[in-house]
Amino acid sequence: MKLHLMLLAVLLCCVTLPSRAADKPNIVVILVDDMGFSDIGSYGGEISTPNLDALAKNGLRFSNFYNTARCCPTRASLMTGLYSHQAGVGHMTEDRGLPGYSGRLNDKSVTFAEALKPAGYFTAMTGKWHVGQNLGAVPWERGFDRSLNAAAGGFFFQDSPRAKVFLNGVEASSDGVSLPKQWYSTDLWTQYGLRFIDEARAKKQPFLLYLAHNAPHFPLQAPPEDIARWRGKFKAGWDKLRAARYQRQIKMGLIDKRWPLSSRAADVPAWDSLTPQQQERYDHMMAIYAATMERMDKAIGDLVKGLQQRGELENTLILFMSDNGGNAESGVRGKLDGQNPGDAQSDVFVGECWATLNNTPFVRYKHYTDEGGIATPLIAYWPKGIAKARRGQIEAQPGHVIDIMATCLDVAGAAYPKEHKGKAITPLQGTSLRPAFAGKALNRTQPLFWEHEENRAVRDGNWKLVALANKPWRLYDLATDRTEQHDLAGTQPERVKTLVAQWDAWAARSQVLPLGGWRAEQKKGRKGEQAKGKLSQKTRFELKNGDTLERSESPSIAGRGFTITAKINAQKPDGVIVAQGGVAQGYALYLQGGKLVFALRRSNELYKATTTQNIVGAHEITAKVASDSVLSLIVDGTLAATGKAPGPLTTMPVDGLQVGNDTGGLVGAYGADNKFGGTIESVVIEVGP
């Protein structure tokens, strides 16, 4: 009898129980959008983020973790473990006819969902996808069993004009798809994430949940009661708040006191130089940003509570990070547009002034490969998998979003495939972060690399080489100068030469070249915006001062001539009358030093017609791009200036259109503070054949 009992005990110990809780961990990857390095409390911020701070206190904070500097490339790298160009998403979601710039996840990559499914995982995603849904790369065909997603974001409330959500591949407005009548996207992504987790539990499967918040990306929107709580909290201004964040970071051990706080950008004014009205405006826009952050933190708290209530928290690895640095895209002044800023119809950006606070203590912003553009928090939380002695500590080893796939595979006991659906797969580029959970060294054998919009960087150990587009390389010793204040390139030419050679070799093997491929002409014949008819078909646009059009609403001017007629009353010598596009393609009609300028930006080069006489007071102006690409300016019926471009625009500009300002990528040779000084009675644009 005793022998039988002993045998039974041995057999019970060897049986694999149907519950997944005994072995494979769950994995939750949380990506937020346009959040700076210092915005959350556990990285020095004053914005209330108690739930994230609790994860950091009981988990591990990485102080040298990186993204790719931009939305789409980071998502591609995070999901595939490849550099974004290798996955086909070297820039945004337009197909440029080049392997590294196809605008969609390619078939030489696998997502972490596709890699974890063979290991028995239930896979789900909620939130912002933005890796080529417009070109056919969709979550339900890239390994996710369940999904509730936005193709590219751009909204928070259900009544936003841009709100479009897909549930398991079916648009939410379609028959049979039911969402709450009223929702806020941050909460919606979390609610459905928990629903999908319940499906996994019912199937007794471990789960992967990829939760991609669109917060705090523009247009910044939040419930009014959330915004009201933050009004007046930022009137100390970016200078004092930035200094306070920096001191908290030093005290926390995130920042070495040897690294000086980077200087305020030259075009950002001192807070104390602003009028009370200007300070009120800036406080308002940052209150909206803080409200989106607070709501996002609360939703993460709801997710953690939901995992705890379901008995899943102990064996769930949670990874939290941002897709790029804080965003200065709207220029120095930011945007606070709409009758009720922060509601579904409004358009709010924090702008460059507050982005300097977001990215404390670093220089530059989203788009750039300086630390301000690529440094992100990474919080790792896993009660069962992170050593108790490590909890609450800071990990200084460098990491990159290419490491997320390797980490997921490692903790799940899954293998990275050599081929998928009959296609050879590009070898994994990242390394697992799991050794850091136990205080061990990462097994990294290669430097880390970056390229975005020709901004380049490589980090090998503590040495970082970085360059702006078309600018010389700069060298920094990050051990003593993480804030990139002292360029050593002139004193260490051999080190520069070695790092440049490493970057060149990486670029050649990783589909980065040709450099500038992101500006290549958009490929025809694919299911892109032009092929799908998503660009405006209108040929006449009647506009007024303050009007803003999204890209899809703007005049379709690629390969075509067009005419602008504007009635203005100029009271100041500078300012934009109308602009469409940005630094690669577009046009702008503006005053500069009293002269009227009509500029065409074609493939990054600027071609202009400029009047010799000053323009003051009331005038009717006509600016024209003829079919032979001659630029002409007519003032009150008289030809005033001409110019010549080598041809029409090669592709539709990425940025939309604005009347009276240019707050996106700057088309003309003017600064970010370019609001028109005077009145604009009307602007009419007519597009030719």
Describe every region a protein language model picked out.
Residues L11-C13:
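Repetitive helical segments and hydrophobic/amphipathic motifs
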Residues T16-P18:
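N-terminal signal peptide c-region/cleavage motif recognized by signal peptidases
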Residues A380-Y381, R459, D477, K567, ...:
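Short, well-ordered beta-strand micro-motif
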Residues A508-Q511:
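Acidic/polar, glycine-enriched structural segments that form the non-catalytic walls/loops
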